[in-house]
Amino acid sequence: EEHHDFGYGLRKEFWHRGIVTEAGKAVVEQVKKDGLTYITATHDKENPRSGNVMKKLGMKYCYSYEERWQPKDITVIFRMYQLNFDGNDDRVYKKYWYQYENHFVEEI
């Protein structure tokens, strides 16, 4: 299945200024115009502000999974969000669900 993951990173001195949200809205509009049926994004559970950006972009939380994250070799719980553009609100990208043994749905 073709997959389009939305990712971002910002230097600390630029945090909390709405930059990622503003840029993200433009990206979402463009990929929607380009005909993508959906995009996904993940964030570390310990970084809930990143999840807030995803929510502001209209993304919905789908599930969480535990991954041994490299290069730091630490266990991280990631939350997976998705935004469907074609009206198929039941579609959920399940690659991470199947790829990682420890997966679950949180009450957020």
Across the structure, where does each feature detected by a protein language model lie?
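Acyl-donor (CoA/ACP) binding surface of acyl/acetyltransferases
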Residues: 1-108
